[in-house]
Swiss-Prot record:
It comes from the Bacteria. It catalyses: uridine(55) in tRNA = pseudouridine(55) in tRNA. CDD domains: PseudoU_synth_EcTruB, PUA_TruB_bacterial. One of its GO terms (molecular function) is RNA binding. Keywords: Isomerase, tRNA processing. PANTHER family: PSEUDOURIDYLATE SYNTHASE TRUB1 (PTHR13767:SF2), TRNA-PSEUDOURIDINE SYNTHASE (PTHR13767). One of its GO terms (biological process) is mRNA pseudouridine synthesis. This is tRNA pseudouridine synthase B. Belongs to the pseudouridine synthase TruB family. Type 1 subfamily. The keyword tRNA processing applies.
Length: 311
């Protein structure tokens, strides 16, 4: 009897960096993460907030030490390009849902532009029933699938910018930059109601997360076809997540103290960081290796998160 030896497990690699992935429609964020993690044979990886399966676009993936800073992207503003169809409301607020009602579309482009302008700034959104937001420990979409509607409190979000991209009625494409927690489906529905005809979302593509943009992203198919060296070259450094923070450079002695978690007096530094009181700062050694992030407060630089490898 012939025995078949089990295939040896491929060794996992300790990678540090950020992959800007262009997620396709139809794939969940977790599935995209696992595919990328397998391709890179990475020991540790995580994403920076889910992107709905029906949405495409920028999904930053963090490897190794970069996972320590993924929360910063969770909190960051997001930019999307979206298309809505006026005159039709659906159960889910997008093209996957059943049609609730249809109405005539009597507005013109000028009315659309005026409606968009009304939604810039702080607005209150009622989260959609088809969402992962939980009520009594249960996702809202589970109630919705059971035919139940539960009361949801409105939440304040901020629309930083909202611009018309194209208007081919009944289809309207817009670009929006918004704070975390914004539901673009709900935004489309609310714009439709403001126009008196209702609307649902037919396309959603994320083009920006904080300082990161889609133009530098790569698809899973391209990664699959690439060599390992080519894949590795696509990884951005850990500090790509932190580019909006001011920075400070430490000499060897101060760097050693910082990496041991010691607080440093700002007066000890060769140059003070250009940070507001209580602001966060990127910290580097004399060779421009990232040591971590600190908070500058009351004349002291206090370590907040350390990068073990100096990636």
């Amino acid at each position: 009897m012939t025995t078949v030896s089990p295939r040896p497990r491929m060794a996992r690699r300790a990678l540090d960096g950020v992959l800007l992935l262009d997620k396709p429609v139809g794939l969940s964020s977790n599935d995209a993460l696992m595919r990328a993690k397998r391709l890179y044979q990475a020991k540790k990886a995580g994403h920076t907030g889910t992107l709905d399966p029906l949405a495409s676009g920028l999904l930053p993936l963090c490897f190794g030490e970069a996972t320590k800073f993924s929360q910063d992207l969770l909190e960051a503003d997001k930019t999307y390009e979206a298309t809505m169809r006026l005159g039709v409301r659906t159960t889910t607020g997008d093209a996957e849902g059943d049609v609730l009602d249809t109405r005539d579309v009597s507005c013109d482009e000028a009315a659309v532009r005026a409606a968009l302008a009304r939604f810039v700034g702080e607005i209150v959104q009622v989260p959609p029933m088809y969402s992962a937001l939980k009520r009594d420990g249960k996702p809202l979409y589970e109630y919705a699938r059971a035919g139940q509607t539960v009361e949801r409190e409105g939440r304040t979000v901020t629309i930083r910018a909202l611009a018309l991209v194209s208007c081919a009625l009944p289809d309207v494409t817009f670009r929006v930059t918004c704070s975390k927690g914004t539901y673009v489906r709900t935004l489309a529905e609310d714009i439709g109601e403001a126009l008196g005809c209702g609307a649902h979302l037919t396309m959603l593509r994320r083009t920006g997360v904080g300082p990161l943009t889609l133009e530098h992203a790569v698809t899973l198919d391209a990664l699959d076809a690439a060599t390992q060296d080519e894949r590795d070259a696509r990884l951005a450094p850990v500090d790509a997540l932190l580019s909006t923070f001011p920075c400070v450079k430490l000499d060897a002695a101060l760097a050693t103290r910082f990496l041991h978690g010691q607080r440093l007096k700002l007066s000890e530094l060769a140059a003070r960081p250009d940070a507001a009181e209580g602001g966060r700062v990127r910290v580097y050694d004399a060779d421009d290796r990232l040591l971590g992030v600190a908070r500058a407060s009351e004349g002291v630089l206090a370590p907040e998160r350390l990068v073990v490898t100096g990636a």
